[in-house]
Amino acid sequence: TLLTTLPAISKTIFNSQPLNQERLVVLAQAVGGNRWKLLVLEQIKPRPLCWETRPDGLVNPTLNNFNFAGICNRYLDSNGYSLRSSGEDVAHSFRLRIKQSRDRLELKALDPARSVPITVASAILPQRHRDAFVKLNLEPGWKLERRIYQGRKLSHVYFAHPDPVNLLIAKASAHQGPSAFKQLGAPKAPLPPPISIAKNSVIHGKGPIRLLVIPYRP
């Protein structure tokens, strides 16, 4: 039996359990414009199939064609999935969002207090279809795990990585590289404009004026 909801609990009270990655799929669903929705499907029983991959690379959610209770699990929002790093929940600070850049989708873990997002999964976008989904492939080191509370399995999956958050941020920052402003180097002070005096101009000022003295020679 999977527990579905729990009150807010300390991040250290949950454990996790490895899952068979072949029985899960991470999907992106087009919801309008360049916006995408993240969902995870899990195959509990072998048949019928909860999803099928189409020849064009998109994924059909076949679980919509039958009563999938006890056969498939769906994880549709932050109640069903979150981020786990180095054995700790970090859902209190990170949010999972799908970003589109031209023909590429990336699942990002975003923390408003940090400027560099962590890439969790990605995919090349074959095409956009409202009734079919795009499969996202987890980046190296990332796996889906089950949330465990006092030995009981919960209806919640983790996007989990063994490295701590600070190391993941450092790797993401190194991969992103220096910004264009940093590559330009420190700005230099502008040179002062050249001083030019017109032939018939008069110089006004205080104090003596040094004059060029030419010695007289008879």
Named regions from a protein language model:
Residues 9-63, 128, 138-177, 185:
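Extracellular/luminal recognition modules and glycoprotein regions
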Residues 42-108:
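Structured domain cores in non-transmembrane regions
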Residues 83-217:
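Low-complexity intrinsically disordered segments
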